[in-house]
């Protein structure tokens, strides 16, 4: 749904057969450990984190898409007033919720690899790109990369 409402060419990539097979194996129980049943409190927490993550991600992507469609430049309103990369925060929350439910270290290891190898690299590239705007330094002082600055 997000792809059709707020397309982002930077994330459109073709998946190879090998990549698709690897993704299937990672999310299936073929290579995984015995499944634990998550407690009601853990499921409730995971659902809350997932839901909030989806809302943050969709709101940030919507805001970014429509703001940049009509006004190029640094976005400093809405969610971006507090966090420089709210869309990544939302995705991190979403995937963390899935890993919480599984209750095993393998999903966390995979997520750490994705967060550092993909998300962090893209965030740093985006920050380097945004640094060309004159208001960047002041904006960066007032906002957190993924978590709002309190002071």
What are these regions (language model features)?
Residues 1-33, 45-49:
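Intramembrane catalytic core of multi-pass membrane enzymes that act on lipidic substrates
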Residues 31-151:
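Hydrophobic transmembrane alpha-helices
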């Amino acid at each position: 749904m997000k792809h059709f409402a707020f397309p982002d060419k930077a994330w459109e990539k073709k998946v190879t057969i090998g990549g698709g097979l690897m993704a299937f194996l990672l999310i299936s129980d073929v290579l995984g450990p015995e499944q634990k049943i998550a407690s009601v409190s853990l499921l409730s927490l995971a659902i809350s984190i997932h839901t909030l993550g989806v809302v943050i991600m969709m709101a940030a992507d919507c805001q970014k898409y429509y703001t940049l469609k009509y006004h190029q430049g640094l976005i400093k309103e809405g969610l971006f007033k507090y966090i420089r990369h709210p869309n990544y925060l939302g995705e991190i929350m979403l995937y963390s919720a899935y890993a919480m439910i599984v209750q095993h270290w393998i999903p966390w290891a995979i997520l750490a690899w994705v967060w550092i190898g993909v998300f962090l690299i893209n965030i740093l590239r985006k920050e380097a790109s945004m640094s060309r705007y004159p208001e960047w330094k002041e904006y960066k002082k007032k906002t957190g990369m993924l978590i709002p600055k309190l002071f």
